[in-house]
UniProtKB/Swiss-Prot annotation:
Binding site for Zn(2+) 1: 70, 72, 85, 88
Function: DNA-dependent RNA polymerase catalyzes the transcription of DNA into RNA using the four ribonucleoside triphosphates as substrates.
InterPro entries xrefs: DNA-dir_RpoC_beta_prime (IPR045867), DNA-dir_RpoC_beta_prime_bact (IPR012754), RNA_pol_asu (IPR000722), RNA_pol_N (IPR006592), RNA_pol_Rpb1_1 (IPR007080), RNA_pol_Rpb1_3 (IPR007066), RNA_pol_Rpb1_3_sf (IPR042102), RNA_pol_Rpb1_4 (IPR007083)
Domain of life: Bacteria
CDD domains, per the entry: RNAP_beta'_C, RNAP_beta'_N
Gene from which the chain derives: rpoC
Identification of the protein by name: DNA-directed RNA polymerase subunit beta'
Entry note: cofactor: Binds 1 Mg(2+) ion per subunit.
Signal sequence annotation: none
Family the UniProt entry places it in: Belongs to the RNA polymerase beta' chain family.
Length: 1395
């Protein structure tokens, strides 16, 4: 029977569980796991190497050392399986049971579990409502604690020192009970009545007023309730039995020379056992109290060290002064169980080697060295050799392969055919870092890689290595071929643009062959077809660049795939005609009838993919690459020093700039400008000079003048190699050429501030020593940045993956009507991202109407593809409401409609797509790229000169958005609001440009005026912020005296002005201007530090007059150094140091009573109580008394805090803010990421909410819960007609969000393992295994991708089983009832016997 049970037990498949529960182990449970008590500290006998009986490696407890053999050797072999040897007591079985059988130690005295004691907040402390220090004093035998006060005046859980205890004993005798050590805490915990406490606290909560007490009680209530629900008992936090880990998980290995290598755990266990045995002996001997106490304390310390060494006091060290690795250390950190063995495993059948170029490969191929292939495909080769009859056994096959017989190679060819291999390059930053290829066998020892996939791998051939993996099973091969093949990964998942794009030499070749040249050989010829043009080129009758006419045949591809011909005589060049021969039919010739730079080639491949599909694109990409390589060779473009032409104008520009700088310097010395202004202006002058030199140089390089056929002079694009390389996008940029042939310009110090002496030389002229020395700053900073930021970026990616890993596409449509509003993104007047790019591949949330009409252009829930976007653009739609993952209403995962297009495939996203991980990779991957690319411009300061005007680029109508303005004495408009924008509207009513104009800007035209291109419409001073009067008023000074201001004379004009001193010094009064006007009464304006006062005391001010100017700070350069940490700050939702102050309510601004160092801001709404806020005096406010503000408007400048935006402006505002800020950082680096990915992460950051009103739900006020849980609970409550809970969404940083996920397995494997597991155990948490990480850890298919269907089937099967069981139980109940009725009837019928 036992064997049968065993057999059944083995049959049970391990993955058939639905969730994992973690809890506290009760002593009985620990004993039930155990196979015997470990009584001795001995490990193995050093002579025989056999484990000692009852020791830490005892074979009787843990199982045999050799398979099916008992320790003394009486029973050997399989036939005795299951026998227990009567001599040595060992069960005859497999030795691997030594990995799973546990033992236990019966502790002579209870011991507190350090995790529940010291892991903050201390669970034991919270349970007993005592402080951690008090509990520690009891545990480590410094104080007594009252366990049972009896009829005395003492309180339960009161602490008594030794003297107090003796006094109490004298006074009360044995009426009370006080103890020390873990027994005392054990008794206290055991005496707790959890149910009664919970009920009492629930009643008490509503009546509590103090916030701190309420918080504390809520915390304790949550803890007690979790004990109530989980079935854990509080006293189980104190150990009375200690489990012992199976011996094979803490091995002891004999080294040669009689020494042993052992796991640290064995040392820790030995200490525990030694101290425990000593304590038992002392107790038996009834030793004096003080000795026993000391021994108990040592036992407590030994168990602490075993569970978590170093958590309390000094870590216990081994013989080599290194802290011992405890159980907690085994599971946490990069080398711990989770990250080392469960999430990352080494794989079989893999190899690695250096990579080289394979320019002749097709896109789906890679070159695999024969040696590697032979090794990797061994099992397949053995099988084939046996199947062919070339070898009789595996051994013979092995011999054949080792001898490398000729037939082995034939078999290898056959095995490899159609069997894809995976190539991976570390670091794998996104999913394109592992792709599948078909191997072709090559001689040599280096793997050959197709040049076009280098971009995806970020690989180059300067010694990079790659790993090869072999997918073994049919399913794996199928997935490799269908999903991972390089030919299936043409589009980048980050932005949906082709990632298989030619670069470098290929671009150079294509650019060279598609350029035109004036008066080239063969100009003006006519050809009947591109083939004829090619013949003319091959025979030397025409050159590549000759301008000719060619008859071009184009094919229009219809929807059904049929092609119609169209023939036109086109002006083109010979080279372009030749290029048209390699393109697939169906692409318009105009795509290549131009000089093909990198952007154009990318556009060409994109068009090809969208119109002709995958297969043609792959073929085209290969053909384009071969052609490019060929013509790059023919071009033979090389760079000589004479190619870097220095412009003649450079000398004059630099002299002019130096003169301007001298002038500024003189003004500074005569006190006209402050040091900061001088610095800013000098830097502006040099930035402008640099731009001018660069412009002159590029004009010089890019155009040359030649004679045409008629003997006239004509301009044409230059054939200078340096220019061609940069212009085509093959290598280098204008910024780099500027350093070669213009001037190096301004350099930055390592701290980011700009050195004001520029490097006027360039690399062709050479730098002198000082210039070279200044340059080294930037170069070194670049290298240092690289090293640091690679790690930072990797960590950011890890956090992103962790927070987003469980977001999977779950269903088709969640049915929401919500969405986000999309408008074109405008920065600095330019449209940086047109609407079409932002909405492409999104689903429309509500019908899109034609502007000004009710005509529906696109209905809701339609996916916008290229054609629809073009249609919307031609109808000049300027805003669209689209579905977004942020507003998706699925409880778990997101729906396909809210996500939209799968960027890497170009169609609607499929079910089971792991959009979270893709998003994390798309954001993280360029982060690493950026950090590796800081230093290419060698730290040259790339700071735009400060803007001081708005110059319009297009002709149209000027409109002011949310403007407040006054007219000054010259009848010009002066802006007096913070959020004014100028927009330029064209004749179709489309917004063409948008500019922010600052407070105090003066407009040259009026609202709704017509402006022409190039006109300057607004001016302001970029270096200072003016204070402008809005009405006629009399000015008087208040608190302006020598203590806080000083006079400064302007030597040019002889005027004196008052400048405010630094007010951050102690008790400085704040100077004010008082404005007195008839209709508005008094208004005061406070002046911050360093303000220059332009008004005079007692003057009559007109509207638009400038009363004072506040200087602006000088600017630092923006390197991505600001970039990566900035992105991390945004995703971590960190509060900035001095955040902008936002208005908490809408209303009128006023001032209240001041206190030390702070002013009191009062906002009075129309119909509610005034809101007050204290603001530090030194903060510069944007608002004046009497102004009206809207809720969420900026009152004091500074970086905005996302938490404030969420609280005051809502979810859509905060998501817009984060998306735009993150995008700005990436855009600065020229990286494109789709907004979707950032939204996915934001959705995860907004998962939690704070309960503001509990209603009839089980939540507590102030508790933090998952939004989805509240929604589910509220739906239930509404069904029952009860009051739902109300909540406020909270924004969590990605680290916090990952740690507070529902799944404790996922959180524990991320960070802070101890804390997460402690919390989960106390709450008796269940992990539903919803996310990807949890499933990887328990060793199942993940519920995404191809595993999605498996999991769905499993759930369906479980449901069916459950229903079947219910039906069965119902029918069983029916049967039972019928039976009882039948029996009763019989009883009634049987005649009674007494008759």
């Amino acid at each position: 029977m036992k064997d049968l049970l065993k057999f059944l037990k083995q049959q049970h498949k391990s993955e058939e569980f639905d969730n994992i529960r973690i809890g506290l182990a009760s002593p009985d449970m620990i004993r039930s796991w155990s196979f015997g008590e470990v009584k001795k500290p001995e490990t193995i006998n050093y002579r025989t190497f056999k484990p000692e009986r009852d020791g830490l490696f005892c074979a009787r407890i843990f199982g045999p050392v050799k398979d099916y053999e008992c320790l003394c050797g009486k029973y050997k072999r399989l036939k005795h399986r299951g026998v227990i040897c009567e001599k040595c007591g060992v069960e005859v079985t497999l030795t691997k049971v030594r990995r799973e059988r546990m033992g236990h130690i019966e502790l002579a005295s209870p011991v507190a579990h350090i995790w529940f004691l010291k892991s903050l907040p201390s669970r034991i402390g919270l349970m007993l409502d005592m402080t951690l220090r008090d509990i520690e004093r009891v545990l480590y035998f410094e104080s007594y604690v009252v366990a049972e006060p009896g009829m005395t005046t003492l309180e339960r859980s009161q602490l008594l020192s030794e003297e107090e205890y003796l006094d109490a004993l004298e006074e009360h005798g044995d009426e009370f009970e006080a103890k020390m050590g873990a027994e005392a805490v054990f008794e206290l915990l055991k005496a707790l009545d959890v149910d009664a406490d919970v009920a009492a606290m629930r009643e008490e909560l509503p009546s509590i007023n103090s916030e701190t007490r309420r918080k504390k009680i809520t915390k304790r209530l949550k803890l007690l309730e979790s004990f109530q629900l989980s079935g854990n008992k509080p006293e189980w936090m104190i150990l009375t039995v200690l489990p012992v880990l199976p011996p094979d998980l803490r091995p002891l290995v004999p080294l040669d020379g009689g020494r042993f290598a052992t796991s640290d755990l064995n040392d820790l266990y030995r200490r525990v056992i030694n101290r425990n045995n000593r304590l038992k002996r002392l107790l038996d001997l009834a030793a004096p109290d003080i000795i026993v106490r000391n021994e108990k304390r040592m036992l407590q310390e030994a168990v602490d060290a075993l569970l978590d060494n170093g958590r309390r006091g000094r870590a216990i060290t081994g013989s080599n002064k290194r802290p011992l690795k405890s159980l907690a250390d085994m599971i946490k950190g990069k080398q711990g169980r989770f990250r080392q063995n469960l999430l990352g495993k080494r794989v079989d059948y893999s190899g690695r080697s250096v990579i080289t170029v394979g320019p002749t490969l097709r896109l789906h191929q890679c070159g695999l060295p024969k040696k590697m292939a032979l090794e990797l495909f061994k099992p397949f080769i053995y099988g084939k050799l046996e199947g062919r009859g070339l070898a009789t056994t595996i051994k013979a096959a092995k011999k054949l392969v080792e001898r490398e017989d000729p037939e082995v190679w034939d078999v290898l060819d056959e095995v490899i055919r159609e069997h894809p291999v995976l190539l991976n390059r570390a670091p794998t930053l996104h999913r394109l870092g592992i792709q599948a290829f078909e191997p072709t066998l090559i001689e040599g020892k280096a793997i050959q890689l197709h040049p076009l996939v280098c971009a995806a791998y970020n690989a180059d051939f300067d010694g990079d290595q790659m790993a090869v993996h072999v997918p073994l099973t049919i399913e794996a091969q199928l997935e490799a071929r269908a999903l991972m093949m390089s030919t299936n990964n043409i589009l980048s998942p980050a932005n949906g643009e082709p990632i298989i794009v030619p670069s470098q030499d290929v671009v150079m070749g294509l650019y060279y062959m598609t350029r035109d040249r004036v008066n080239g050989l063969g100009e003006g010829m006519m050809f009947t077809s591109p083939d004829e043009a090619e013949k003319a080129y091959r025979t030397g009758n025409a050159e590549l660049h000759a301008r000719v006419k060619v008859r071009i045949t184009e094919y229009d591809v219809a929807e059904d795939g049929s092609k119609t011909e169209k023939v036109t005589l086109t002006d083109t060049t010979v080279g372009r005609a030749i290029l048209s021969l390699v393109l697939p039919k169906g692409l318009p010739f105009e795509l290549i009838n131009q000089a093909m730079g990198k952007k154009m080639i990318s556009r060409l491949l994109n068009a090809c993919y969208r119109t002709l599909g995958l297969k043609d694109t792959v073929i085209a990409a290969d053909q384009i690459m071969y052609t490019g390589f060929h013509y790059a060779m023919i071009a033979g473009a090389s760079v000589g020093i004479d190619d870097m032409v220095i412009p003649d104008a450079k000398k004059d520009i630099i002299e002019g700039a130096e003169a301007e700088v001298r002038e500024i310097q003189e003004q500074f010395q005569s006190g006209l400008v402050t040091a900061g202004e001088r610095y800013n202006k000098v830097i502006d002058i040099w930035s402008n000079a640099n731009e001018k030199v660069a412009k002159a140089m590029m004009e010089n390089l890019s155009i040359e003048t030649v004679k045409n056929r008629d003997g006239e002079m004509e301009d044409q694009a230059s054939f200078n190699s340096v220019f061609m390389m940069a212009d085509s996008g093959a290598r280098g940029s204008a910024a780099q050429i500027r350093q070669l042939a213009g001037m190096r310009g301004l350099m930055a110090k390592p701290d980011g501030s700009i050195i004001e002496t520029p490097i006027t030389a360039n690399f062709r002229e050479g730098l002198n020593v000082l210039q070279y020395f200044i340059s080294t700053h930037g170069a070194r900073k670049g290298l240092a940045d690289t090293a640091l930021k690679t790690a930072n970026s990797g960590y950011l990616t890890r956090r992103l993956v962790d927070v987003a890993q469980d977001l999977v596409i779950n269903n088709e449509d969640c049915g929401t009507f919500e969405g986000v509003k999309m408008t074109p993104l405008i920065e600095g007047g330019d449209v940086v991202e047109p609407l079409r790019e932002r909405v492409l591949g999104r689903t429309v949330a509500e019908d899109v109407l034609k502007p000004g009409t009710n005509e529906i252009l696109v209905e809701r829930n339609v996916l916008l593809d290229e054609a629809l976007v073009d249609m919307l653009e031609s109808n000049s739609v300027d805003q669209i409401q689209v579905r977004s993952v942020i507003t998706c209403e699925n409880d778990f995962g997101v729906c396909a409609k809210c996500y939209g297009r799968d960027l890497a495939r170009g169609h609607m996203v499929g079910h089971g797509e792991a959009v979270g991980v893709i998003a994390a990779q798309s954001i993280g991957e360029p982060g690493t790229q950026l950090t590796m690319r800081t230093f290419h411009i060698g730290g040259a300061a790339s700071r735009a000169s400060a803007e001081n005007s708005v110059q319009v680029k297009t002709t149209g109508t000027l409109k002011l958005q949310n403007a407040k303005f006054v007219r000054n004495t010259d009848d010009k408009v002066v802006i007096v609001s913070r959020s004014t924008e100028i927009t330029i509207i064209d004749d179709q009513g489309r917004e063409k440009e948008r500019y922010k104009v600052p407070y105090g800007a003066i407009l040259t035209t009026d609202d709704n005026a017509t402006v022409t291109s190039g006109e300057v419409v607004a001016n302001w001073d970029p270096h200072s912020h003016p204070i402008v009067t809005e009405r006629q008023a009399k000015i008087s000074f208040a608190d302006i005296d020598d203590s806080n201001t000083e006079m400064q004379q302007d030597e040019l004009t002889g005027l004196t002005r008052i400048v405010v001193n630094d007010l951050s010094k102690a008790n400085a009064k704040e100077p004010k201007l008082i404005l007195e006007s008839d209709e508005h009464g008094l208004q005061e304006i406070r002046l911050p530090s360093f303000t220059t006062i332009e008004a005079t005391d007692g003057m009559q001010a007109k509207p638009g007059d400038v009363l004072a100017r506040i200087p602006q700070e000088s600017s630092k350069t923006r390197d991505i150094t600001g970039g990566l940490p900035r992105v991390a700050d945004l995703f971590e939702a960190r509060k900035p140091k001095e955040p902008a102050i936002l208005a908490e309510v809408s209303g009128t601004i006023g001032w209240g009573k001041e206190t030390k160092g702070k002013k009191r801001l009062v906002i009075t709404p129309k119909d509610a109580d005034a809101y007050e806020e204290m603001i530090p005096k030194w903060r510069q406010l944007n608002v004046f008394e009497g102004e009206n503000v809207e809720k969420g408007e900026v009152i004091a400048d500074g970086p905005e805090s996302p938490h404030d935006i969420l609280r005051l402006r809502g979810i859509s505002a905060v998501s817009n803010y984060i998306v735009n800020e993150v995008q700005e950082v990436y855009r600065l680096q020229g990286v494109k990421i789709n907004d979707k990915h950032i939204e996915v992460v934001i959705r995860q950051m907004l998962r939690k909410c704070m309960i503001t009103y509990a209603g009839d739900s089980n939540f507590l006020e102030g508790e933090q819960v998952e939004v989805s849980n509240v929604k589910i609970a509220n739906r239930e409550l509404e069904k029952q007609g009860k009051i739902p809970a109300q909540y406020e969404t909270q924004l969590l940083g990605i680290t916090k969000a990952s740690l507070s996920t529902e799944s404790f397995i996922s959180a524990a494997s991320f960070q802070e393992t101890t804390r997460v597991l402690t919390e989960a155990a106390v709450q008796g948490k269940e992990d539903e295994l919803r996310g990807l990480k949890e499933n990887v850890i328990v060793g199942r298919l993940i519920p995404a991708g191809t595993g999605f269907a498996y999991h769905q089937k499993r759930t369906a099967r479980k449901l069916a089983e459950r229903q079947a069981v219910e039906e069965l139980s119902v029918s069983a109940a029916d049967a039972e009832q019928a039976l009882t009725e039948a029996l009763n009837a019989e009883v009634m019928d049987t005649p009674s016997s007494d008759e």
